[in-house]
């Protein structure tokens, strides 16, 4: 569907066709009156592979993939529908008995928010740390220094329990379908997207085929027009109607060589050839 542009001088589509499931690849989050949506990001290659599986009639199975890395429990994912839940953990390794390194932080958090949660837990007495440092460069790296005698293993458990080293995410796969909200699992969304991609590719090929057929049709007309010297008698016709009638008659004997019916537009283009 086409709508008027902001100044009314042009037309613009009310929506742009999408061949790739960008919603699932990047994830999205939004809120409206009485409803909300939350889509987790997914792996590009997996989306392509599962789209191919759908088109081949195979089962579609895939899970979110977080750019930050980390560990996740998807046992309650339920295809991203309402009520589903995903637990995401950072990775923590013990450098020595006094030092912990937090890396690959949970999706939806930042190093700043995670450090703040650790400091709050320390202030409340949930954990005991000596110092915390942010050594993040290209990848997240937070250094936690412990007091002597503090168990690093128990501290790791406490970090998961009382800080943003572990977070719970509640996906909500809600989309707008035909101007109405609809709850649809991510696997179903991928199937619809794959089918839409096939339809769009077919439409593009049909449009391109029509363009090529038009070019072929006119090049055939042009060849017949010039080779049979139809332009020589143009000066005998004083108006466009009689000229077109003459050309229609001349082309009628070549009907079998033409790909489609001749139109007035075709004849107009022929009469604009510079040699006339």
What label would you give each PLM region?
Residues 1-18:
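P-loop NTPase nucleotide-binding/switch module
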Residues 16, 22, 28-31, 35-276:
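C-terminal interaction appendages of subunits in large macromolecular complexes
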